[in-house]
């Protein structure tokens, strides 16, 4: 049946009348679910009822647009479609029940099963989600397919109400077959299952509104080498689609239903995954055994952090309500591991810790103890021999000020000596290990690079500073960071290693170091002033000579010389670091700059202002440590090494104290012959 083309319809496709089986159309399975909502007149409905129903699957009926255009003009159909579209938009703004009711009001027609439906359908403007589509299918009567219409028109069962292909109605007037898809032939997967299985109880084809419409999912379904009616895609359905694949207890057929009960615990419909040719083995990426029977690793795990994981998921089994009562579930309690110690016990640097990792110092000669003695002894002599006389004869403010300066000096000394100067974490940028088969003449990876630093000076916009890779710490050091050979650590913004503190001076303790040097200088000058004041006041009040006054106050006179000695070195350090801070440089940067000519010396980190340089150094926030030495150790931390008490101890004796095995005797030429020759 053909229709002439007009402005409002499409040409009817050419229909082959041969008996040869045509290939399946996947497009039809996607497009036939969209019901046409054009307003059809009475004459169009009569034309639909008068269409002969043929059982030939190779033929294809005319589309609704072609049939409608042959019976009515373009202007009439255009006005009817506009009215229908306005009515459809109002119905779309309602709930799902409104759309369901609208779909059940029209009888089954060929327009709802055409390959080219109405272009003004609701589905093109407001497509449904997979959940709403499943709900609509479960509650509405789906239109019959061509196979059902052919079976209904066949003379074998013209009046059979219980035909296998005819829908069965319950007492509420709803079709029970709407929960199962009737269009088996429109889906190629279902047809394949129908051809390979003769049973009627077969799983319904996957929904068109779910992820099964994707091509890659279709490939996963057909990947099994031995498909059967019980085959299902292993692990390809999402959790929102799995509850839809259920079996009805009344009919014994698979049906689509939405289970919204939160207490759903029946796992009988969730079988275990089936192994396919594309499945990975259970020991994938796990260390296996080599030919000699020893464990071998397919990748290096050195420096890797071991993450905790839960046990493997067991296979799903049917859960019975009686079994749940007999065997109640026990809440899972993670196993508590024994205390592995603190972080500082696994640290690889040349650092000694005390007070649980709160204090740290370089493992070497404790010269800082002598520095502390030089601070404590003069202060103790002052409070023992000068403070009482000054408190009673001059003013109590003098001993109080001295006590405050002594507190600042000693406190800053402790902080600068036992504080983390800014130790950078280790083993963050490890180079790949060198194999024995590698070419020894091959160039190694570069260990130097350049970093671009924005300059605050108006003459230059940016400057490049060198950065290096530390082979000892296995990290790329940031700008201004250096490795200290005494501490055996990379220090951030490293200034120098102070032997008087027995610790490095870096970004985290530079402020304490400068405070200690400055307060020690001021304290030494204050000690000299108070000692001389006490001697001179006693001489004037007693009317005696200076020698007699010194003979009366011998300790204050000794403190004058001690204060002068302790004043020189701290004063020099204080002036030097004031000069460095004003320039925006560190001690290491200033020393290295003298390797170049004056024209090539640049200060990349200067703020172009003396005041700003002081603010940046002295008023910057003190960042936390990278290691947290007081924290508990977690197994697999790549920054740390072996625990100190479990490390192999190196012998303190030299090589000459051990027995040296003689080398293998071989041909040594004339020397051996000359030694054996008798003289």
Swiss-Prot record:
Stretches assigned to the DHHC domain: 468-518
Subcellular location per the Swiss-Prot or TrEMBL entry: Endoplasmic reticulum membrane
Mod. after translation: Autopalmitoylated.
Molecular function in Gene Ontology: protein-cysteine S-palmitoyltransferase activity
Reaction catalyzed: L-cysteinyl-[protein] + hexadecanoyl-CoA = S-hexadecanoyl-L-cysteinyl-[protein] + CoA
Highest taxon of source: Eukaryota
Ranges facing Cytoplasmic side: 1-368, 415-511, 576-679
Keyword vocabulary terms for this entry: Acyltransferase, Endoplasmic reticulum, Lipoprotein, Membrane, Palmitate, Transferase, Transmembrane, Transmembrane helix
Keyword Transferase in annotation: yes
Cystine connections: none
Disordered, as annotated region: 1-181, 194-250, 267-338, 640-679
One biological process term in Gene Ontology: protein targeting to membrane
The protein's role, per its UniProt record: Palmitoyltransferase specific for Ras proteins.
Protein name: Palmitoyltransferase ERF2
Species this chain originates from: Gibberella zeae (strain ATCC MYA-4620 / CBS 123657 / FGSC 9075 / NRRL 31084 / PH-1)
């Amino acid at each position: 049946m053909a229709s002439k083309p007009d402005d409002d319809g499409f040409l009817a496709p050419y229909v082959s009348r041969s008996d040869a089986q045509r290939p399946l159309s996947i497009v039809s399975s996607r497009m036939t679910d969209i019901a046409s909502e054009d307003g059809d007149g009475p004459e169009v409905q009569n034309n639909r009822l008068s269409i002969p129903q043929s059982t030939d699957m190779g033929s294809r009926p005319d589309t609704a647009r072609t049939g409608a255009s042959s019976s009515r003009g373009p202007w009439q159909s255009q006005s009817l479609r506009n009215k229908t579209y306005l009515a459809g938009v109002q119905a779309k703004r309602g709930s799902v029940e409104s759309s369901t009711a609208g779909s059940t009001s029209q009888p089954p027609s060929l327009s709802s099963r055409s390959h080219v439906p109405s272009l003004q359908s609701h589905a093109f403007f407001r497509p449904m989600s997979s959940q709403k589509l499943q709900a609509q299918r479960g509650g509405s009567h789906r239109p019959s397919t061509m196979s059902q219409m052919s079976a209904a028109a066949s003379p074998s069962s013209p009046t059979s109400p219980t035909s296998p292909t005819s829908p069965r109605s319950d007492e509420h007037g709803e079709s029970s077959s709407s929960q199962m898809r009737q269009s088996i032939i429109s889906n190629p997967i279902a047809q394949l299952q129908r051809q390979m299985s003769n049973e009627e109880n077969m799983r319904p084809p996957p929904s068109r509104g779910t992820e099964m419409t994707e091509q890659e999912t279709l490939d996963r379904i057909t990947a099994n080498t031995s498909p059967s009616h019980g085959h299902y895609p292993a692990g390809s359905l999402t959790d929102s689609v799995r509850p839809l694949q259920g079996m009805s207890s009344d009919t014994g057929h698979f049906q689509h239903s939405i289970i919204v009960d939160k207490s759903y615990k029946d796992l009988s419909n969730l079988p275990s995954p089936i192994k396919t040719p594309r499945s990975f083995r259970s020991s994938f990426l796990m260390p296996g055994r080599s030919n000699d029977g020893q464990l071998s690793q397919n990748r290096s795990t050195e420096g890797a952090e071991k993450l905790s994981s839960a046990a493997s998921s067991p296979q799903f089994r049917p859960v019975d309500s009686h079994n749940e009562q007999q065997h109640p579930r026990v809440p899972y309690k993670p196993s508590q591991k024994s205390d592995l110690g603190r972080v500082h016990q696994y640290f690889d640097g040349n650092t000694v810790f005390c007070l649980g990792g709160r204090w740290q110092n370089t493992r070497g000669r404790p010269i800082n103890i002598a520095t502390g003695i030089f601070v404590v002894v003069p202060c103790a002599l002052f409070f023992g021999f000068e403070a009482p006389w000054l408190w009673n004869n001059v003013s109590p403010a003098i001993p109080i000020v001295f006590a405050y300066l002594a507190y600042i000096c000693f406190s800053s000394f402790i902080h600068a000596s036992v504080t983390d100067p800014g130790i950078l974490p280790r083993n963050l940028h490890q180079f790949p290990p060198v194999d024995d088969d590698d070419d020894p003449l091959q160039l190694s990876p570069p260990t130097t690079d350049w970093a671009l630093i924005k300059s605050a000076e108006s003459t230059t916009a940016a400057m490049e500073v060198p950065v290096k890779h530390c082979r000892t710490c296995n990290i790329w050091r940031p700008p201004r960071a250096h490795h200290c050979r005494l501490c055996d650590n990379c220090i951030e913004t490293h200034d120098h290693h102070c032997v008087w503190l027995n610790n490095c001076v870096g970004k985290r303790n530079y402020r304490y170091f400068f405070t200690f040097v400055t307060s020690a200088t001021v304290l030494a000058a204050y000690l000299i002033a108070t000692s001389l004041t006490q001697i001179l006041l006693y001489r004037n009040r007693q009317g005696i000579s200076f020698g007699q006054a010194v003979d009366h106050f011998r300790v204050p006179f000794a403190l004058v010389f001690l204060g002068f000695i302790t004043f020189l070195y701290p004063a020099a350090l204080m002036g030097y670091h004031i000069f460095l801070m004003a320039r925006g440089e560190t001690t290491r940067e200033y020393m290295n700059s003298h390797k170049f000519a004056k024209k090539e010396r640049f200060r990349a980190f200067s703020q172009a202002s003396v005041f700003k340089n002081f603010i940046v150094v002295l008023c910057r926030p003190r960042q936390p440590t990278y290691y947290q030495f007081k924290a508990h150790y977690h197994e697999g931390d790549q920054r740390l090494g072996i625990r100190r008490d479990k490390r192999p101890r190196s012998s303190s004796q030299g090589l000459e104290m051990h027995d040296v095995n003689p080398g293998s005797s071989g041909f040594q030429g004339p020397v051996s012959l000359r030694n054996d020759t008798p003289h």
